[in-house]
Regions:
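PAPS-dependent sulfotransferase catalytic domain
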Residues: 127, 132-158, 176-228
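Alpha-helical solenoid repeat scaffolds of the TPR/TPR-like class and their adjacent stem/linker regions
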Residues: 1-176
Length: 228
């Protein structure tokens, strides 16, 4: 209903939600209460009551906050900024294939629209949000969101391993297609670009960008998962 349906102000389900479901869930709180609030917020958005909707979504997020270690995440990014340079890619020995195309960026930035437009070309295919690159990183022993591991992988990967990893990734996303370009739209691959560029130096990366205010408001008003 968030993406495809419209909730009318006179919808009996909405009336029941407000009169019975929300009061019964409020005391316990948690995910069920948060989901009910998000549904109410969606109805308020559809009715044009934007201020009320924003307050309702804020209540929903407070009812079921998503844990996040911002300090650890910042350290993961900063470690790469401080340690990795262009010189680390001068001897990139991975596969020279130009077939893979990554689309990365924020949710709600227009990435799906771009993917659909590109995939309309006869020589471009898409595998959607593939876990292939993240799975590949895990096989190297790289810990998730660990800056030191990422830097070590970029600097120390042997040429034979780089070739093997790149060919494995290409084979997984290619599947049965003969398209010249294959799109992988797993947005969180932006966290793995350092490794990706090392094993596939000729592959394209599209960084989707939308006005930051529009993007953040859109994300705030969507029922995004904790993954995002």
């Amino acid at each position: 209903v968030f993406s495809t349906g419209r909730i009318d102000a006179d919808d009996p389900v909405l009336a029941y939600l407000q009169a019975h479901i929300l009061p019964s869930l409020e005391k316990a709180g948690g995910i069920a209460y948060a989901d009910a609030l998000k549904l109410l917020g969606k109805a308020q958005l559809d009715a044009g009551a934007h201020d009320a909707a924003f307050k309702t979504f804020t209540r929903a997020k407070s009812a079921a906050p998503m844990p996040r270690d911002e300090t650890a995440y910042a350290a993961f990014i900063q470690k790469q900024i401080n340690s990795v340079t262009a010189a680390d890619y001068q001897d990139a020995t991975g596969d020279r294939s130009e077939q893979p195309v990554l689309i990365v960026g924020f949710p709600r930035s227009g990435s799906t629209l771009l993917e659909q437009m590109l995939a309309g070309h006869s020589q471009i295919a898409s595998v959607g949000e593939s876990p292939a690159l993240r799975n590949l990183c895990q096989t190297t022993g790289m810990r998730s969101l660990n800056g030191a591991d990422m830097v070590a992988a970029i600097r120390q990967i042997p040429p034979t391993a780089a070739q093997a990893f790149s060919q494995r990734y290409c084979a997984e996303i290619k599947g049965e297609t003969d398209a010249e370009r294959v799109i992988d739209k797993s947005l969180h691959n932006f966290e793995l670009l350092g490794f990706f560029a090392k094993i596939l130096p000729n592959a394209r990366i599209i960084d989707m960008r939308r006005d930051p205010l529009d993007t953040c408001v859109s994300c705030y008003l969507q029922p995004l998962s904790a993954w995002h």
